[in-house]
Amino acid sequence: MKPENKLPVLDLISAEMKTVVNTLQPDLPPWPATGTIAEQRQYYTLERRFWNVGAPEMATRAYRVPTKYGQVKTRIFYPQPDSPATLFYLHGGGFILGNLDTHDRIMRLLASYSQCTVIGIDYTLSPEARFPQAIEEIVAACCYFHQQAEDYQINMSRIGFAGDSAGAMLALASALWLRDKQIDCGKVAGVLLWYGLYGLRDSVTRRLLGGVWDGLTQQDLQMYEEAYLSNDADRESPYYCLFNNDLTREVPPCFIAGAEFDPLLDDSRLLYQTLAAHQQPCEFKLYPGTLHAFLHYSRMMKTADEALLDGAQFFTAQL
């Protein structure tokens, strides 16, 4: 798509989204566009600090859990002593960026609104880790906490997965992995998916949307994919292109959230339409005027707060 033919996204977004886009952090250095991945990760962590201020306080513990790839960091948020379920949160960042700190406020709000224990899993980033390592680490963490639930004072009889962007793909892929390989980590009561990518190679929204403002041009998306996958054949794996998995049976209830001006929006629409066509429990909600990654900005955006609350309420309704 010739850039001039794309939608003028920054003219169309909501007033509160424009406020976020125009918010300057004076102490923040320029984005290291030509820097190393390590430098970009450092910048991303620094930039997200501002947006994580003011999150709900609650008991929080950090643990390392064993996997076949080595230990993986986790962070547990306890909103109350007797939680009805446990939610595993997988952060976004194109598989190459992000950590438990960049998504701390999101996890705290989700724990507060759901009153469920939330466990963030700091899966190994790409390109150091290639598909399907992140999924296998997530599954290993789930199994570990299922076996040690009493020691960590968590309720693993009912669990869920949640994630944003690349984390949404990992959330659903992990749930399908447990189903397909018949791994018992507790009943998967629901999956919460905010503006994920699920396997489309091209779409209307991928053509009309995406730019320097969201880091989701076609070139960006290709770069994330090449960093994450081990080889070309992985593009068709049912745990990367989730539309190649069996979505006609035993899919946990899915809350699917879309951002209006997100190039990945058609992934969410197709996922919803596929699940609904096969009578799999699901709900789709579009958040008008928003860009990809808007969930981070609940400090300024009521819509971001609403989207987290909607997901939390969907999950608790499944319990």
Curated annotation (Swiss-Prot):
The entry's keywords: Cytoplasm, Hydrolase, Serine esterase
Keyword Cytoplasm appears in the UniProt entry: yes
PROSITE patterns: LIPASE_GDXG_HIS (PS01173), LIPASE_GDXG_SER (PS01174)
Protein name: Acetyl esterase
Function description: Displays esterase activity towards short chain fatty esters (acyl chain length of up to 8 carbons). Able to hydrolyze triacetylglycerol (triacetin) and tributyrylglycerol (tributyrin), but not trioleylglycerol (triolein) or cholesterol oleate. Negatively regulates MalT activity by antagonizing maltotriose binding. Inhibits MelA galactosidase activity.
Highest rank taxon of the organism: Bacteria
Keyword Cytoplasm found: yes
Assembly: Homodimer. Interacts with MalT and MelA.
Organism: Escherichia coli O127:H6 (strain E2348/69 / EPEC)
Cysteine pairings via disulfide bonds: none
Family membership: Belongs to the 'GDXG' lipolytic enzyme family.
GO cellular component: cytoplasm
Ranges spanned by the short sequence motif Involved in the stabilization of the negatively charged intermediate by the formation of the oxyanion hole, renumbered to the chain: 91-93
One term of GO molecular function: carboxylic ester hydrolase activity
Subcellular localization(s) per the UniProt record: Cytoplasm
Top-level taxonomy: Bacteria, Pseudomonadati, Pseudomonadota, Gammaproteobacteria, Enterobacterales
Active site: S165, D262, H292
InterPro entries per the UniProt record, alphabetical: AB_hydrolase_3, AB_hydrolase_fold, Acetyl_esterase, GDXG_lipolytic_enzyme, Lipase_GDXG_HIS_AS, Lipase_GDXG_put_SER_AS
A Pfam family the protein falls into: Abhydrolase_3
EC numbers on record: 3.1.1.-
